[in-house]
């Protein structure tokens, strides 16, 4: 009924998972299964043994069904990531999502493309996902991202193409969030192309912005 992605480096807190599954079981039995279940996630820093929790208590109502009308402002560090979401499987089928094969960073597509199909959400203030970070060869390591920037660009272009954001004008908060998420993807691509610094990277940066201009309306651009 629900689909949760867990990276091979990461893990789920067993006590939190039990509570989430119990709540979903109750909601399904009542016929009020949410399209999207949201929980907190925790950065587990391997270098110094510290941790940092990303929670959404200021963004979402807790322990009840809600929709985008009830969603408040996201801080820059509060994007919905793969770590924080659990989609109802039928929603993933409905959106027709096909992830690029043999490509890193597709978790951004996974969390982004289904959002217009989400009609109901549920947030539990539980630290469910533990995100292990700090390994030298991780895909989010700076030098690794510079080397894989073409895959970041491929994912960003896929996200530009996969939704017509102007079709969401009647859902202001959803549209605002999705434009914001796409802006973050553009910014990340820009940063790593600038860090590369080569003439080829600068050309790729210009090409990406031209691609965006050619594939969205001036209002989105």
Each PLM stretch: what is its role?
Residues 3:
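Short aromatic/hydrophobic "clamp" motif used to bind/position activated sugar donors
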Residues 6-8:
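Catalytic metal- and UDP-sugar-binding loop of GT-A-like glycosyltransferases, i.e.
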Residues 10-122, 129-145:
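Donor-binding/catalytic cores of nucleotide-activated saccharide
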Residues 135, 163-167, 189-197:
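Secondary-structure edge/capping motif, primarily at the C-terminal ends of alpha-helices
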Residues 151-176, 217-219:
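C-terminal, non-catalytic tails of nucleotide-sugar-dependent glycosyltransferases
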Residues 172-180, 202, 206:
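Short, charged, amphipathic alpha-helical segments
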Residues 177-191:
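Amphipathic alpha-helical repeat scaffolds of TPR domains
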Residues 195-221:
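Membrane-interface aromatic/basic loop that binds lipid-linked glycans or pyrophosphate carriers
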């Amino acid at each position: 009924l629900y689909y949760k992605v867990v990276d091979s480096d990461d893990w789920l807190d067993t006590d939190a998972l039990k509570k989430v599954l119990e709540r979903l079981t109750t909601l399904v039995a009542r016929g009020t299964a949410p399209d999207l279940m949201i929980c907190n996630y925790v950065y587990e820093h391997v270098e110094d043994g510290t941790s940092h929790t990303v929670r959404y208590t200021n963004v979402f109502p807790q322990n009840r069904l809600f929709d985008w009308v009830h969603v408040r402002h996201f801080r820059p560090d509060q994007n919905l990531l793969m770590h924080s979401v659990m989609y109802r499987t039928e929603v993933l089928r409905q959106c027709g999502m096909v992830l690029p094969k043999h490509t890193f960073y597709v978790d951004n597509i996974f969390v982004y493309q289904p959002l217009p199909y989400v009609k109901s959400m549920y947030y539990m203030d539980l630290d469910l996902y533990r995100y292990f970070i700090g390994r030298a060869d991780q895909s989010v390591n700076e030098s690794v991202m510079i080397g894989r920037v073409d895959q970041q660009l491929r994912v960003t272009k896929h996200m530009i193409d996969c939704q017509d954001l102007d079709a969401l004008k009647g859902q202001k908060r959803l549209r605002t969030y999705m434009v914001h998420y796409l802006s973050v993807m553009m910014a990340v691509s820009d940063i790593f192309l600038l860090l590369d610094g080569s003439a080829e990277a600068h050309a790729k940066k210009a090409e990406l912005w031209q691609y965006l201009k050619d594939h969205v309306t001036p209002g989105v651009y």
